[in-house]
Every structure is written in C-alpha cells, then in structure tokens.
C-alpha cells in the first residue's frame, strides 16, 4: 500500500512542472522582442530617407547631362559622316557594276535558251499526242 502512495505523488508533480515551464517561457520572449525590433527600426529609416535622395538626385543629373551630350555629339557625326560615304561610294559601284552585268548577261541567256527547249519539247509530245499538233503549227508560223 505504501508503494502505491509514493508512485501517485511522483507522477503528479512532473506534469505540473512541465505546464508551468512552458507557460512562462512563451510570453516573455514575445513581449521584449516585439517592442525592441519596432523601436530601433522606425528611427533608422527616417534619417536615411532624407539623406539618400537629397544628395543623390542633384549630383547625378547635373554632371551627367552636360558631360554626355557635349563630347558625344560633335565627335560622333564629324568623323563618321565623311569617312563612311567617301570610301564606300567609289569602291562599291566601280568593281561591282562592270563585274555583275558583263559576265551575268551573256552566261545566263546562252546556256538557258538552248537547254530549256531541247529537253522540254521531246518530253511533252511523246505522252501527249494532242499537244504535238498545235505546237508545230505555232513554230512554223513564227518562223515564216
């Protein structure tokens, strides 16, 4: 009987201790954490906002605008315009004009005309006899 009584009181205290330990631990960390993070955060962005945009805005546009257009505009158009059209115009038309029309004109019509009619005429009349009758009449009339 005495052993049973000792076990009962032993099981009860550990349950009470666990509950008491969990309850006091949860509330204390939330209370001190919430006010500490908010307090130091609010004053930090206030002094940053006015200091950042004030010195940045006037410094960036002032030196950038006058420096970029002044040296870029006169340097780019002056040396580019005279150098590009002068050497390009005389070099391109001179060697291209005589080479393209001379060798292309005689070569294209000569081999094309005799090759096209020769193999085409005998192939068409063989399978189609009806087309043979009108084709020779047209050729004879043209020759006369």
Swiss-Prot record:
<dbReference type="GO" id="GO:0005737">
    <property type="term" value="C:cytoplasm"/>
</dbReference>
<feature type="repeat" description="8">
    <location>
        <begin position="82"/>
        <end position="89"/>
    </location>
</feature>
<feature type="repeat" description="7">
    <location>
        <begin position="74"/>
        <end position="81"/>
    </location>
</feature>
<feature type="repeat" description="9">
    <location>
        <begin position="90"/>
        <end position="97"/>
    </location>
</feature>
<feature type="repeat" description="11">
    <location>
        <begin position="106"/>
        <end position="113"/>
    </location>
</feature>
<feature type="repeat" description="5">
    <location>
        <begin position="58"/>
        <end position="65"/>
    </location>
</feature>
<feature type="repeat" description="1">
    <location>
        <begin position="27"/>
        <end position="34"/>
    </location>
</feature>
<keyword id="KW-0963">Cytoplasm</keyword>
<feature type="region of interest" description="13 X 8 AA approximate tandem repeats">
    <location>
        <begin position="27"/>
        <end position="129"/>
    </location>
</feature>
<comment type="function">
    <text>Cross-linked envelope protein of keratinocytes. It is a keratinocyte protein that first appears in the cell cytosol, but ultimately becomes cross-linked to membrane proteins by transglutaminase. All that results in the formation of an insoluble envelope beneath the plasma membrane. May participate widely in the construction of cell envelopes in cornifying epithelia characterized by either increased thickness or a requirement for extreme flexibility.</text>
</comment>
<feature type="compositionally biased region" description="Low complexity">
    <location>
        <begin position="13"/>
        <end position="24"/>
    </location>
</feature>
<feature type="repeat" description="2">
    <location>
        <begin position="35"/>
        <end position="42"/>
    </location>
</feature>
<keyword id="KW-0417">Keratinization</keyword>
<keyword id="KW-0677">Repeat</keyword>
<feature type="repeat" description="6">
    <location>
        <begin position="66"/>
        <end position="73"/>
    </location>
</feature>
<dbReference type="GO" id="GO:0031424">
    <property type="term" value="P:keratinization"/>
</dbReference>
<feature type="repeat" description="3">
    <location>
        <begin position="43"/>
        <end position="49"/>
    </location>
</feature>
<feature type="repeat" description="12">
    <location>
        <begin position="114"/>
        <end position="121"/>
    </location>
</feature>
<feature type="region of interest" description="Disordered">
    <location>
        <begin position="1"/>
        <end position="41"/>
    </location>
</feature>
<comment type="similarity">
    <text>Belongs to the cornifin (SPRR) family.</text>
</comment>
<feature type="repeat" description="10">
    <location>
        <begin position="98"/>
        <end position="105"/>
    </location>
</feature>
<feature type="repeat" description="13">
    <location>
        <begin position="122"/>
        <end position="129"/>
    </location>
</feature>
<dbReference type="GO" id="GO:0071944">
    <property type="term" value="C:cell periphery"/>
</dbReference>
<dbReference type="Pfam" id="PF02389">
    <property type="entry name" value="Cornifin"/>
</dbReference>
<protein>
    <recommendedName>
        <fullName>Cornifin-A</fullName>
    </recommendedName>
</protein>
<feature type="repeat" description="4">
    <location>
        <begin position="50"/>
        <end position="57"/>
    </location>
</feature>
């Amino acid at each position: 009987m005495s052993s049973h009584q000792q076990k009962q009181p032993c099981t009860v205290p550990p349950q009470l201790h666990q509950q008491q330990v969990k309850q006091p631990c949860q509330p204390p960390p939330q209370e001190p954490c919430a006010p500490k993070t908010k307090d130091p955060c609010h004053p930090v962005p206030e002094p940053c906002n006015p200091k950042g945009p004030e010195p940045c805005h006037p410094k960036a546009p002032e030196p950038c605008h006058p420096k970029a257009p002044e040296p870029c505009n006169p340097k780019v158009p002056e040396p580019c315009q005279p150098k590009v059209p002068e050497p390009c115009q005389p070099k391109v038309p001179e060697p291209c004009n005589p080479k393209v029309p001379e060798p292309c004109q005689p070569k294209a019509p000569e081999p094309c005309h005799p090759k096209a009619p020769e193999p085409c005429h005998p192939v068409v009349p063989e399978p189609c006899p009806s087309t043979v009758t009108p084709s020779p009449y047209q050729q004879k009339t043209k020759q006369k």
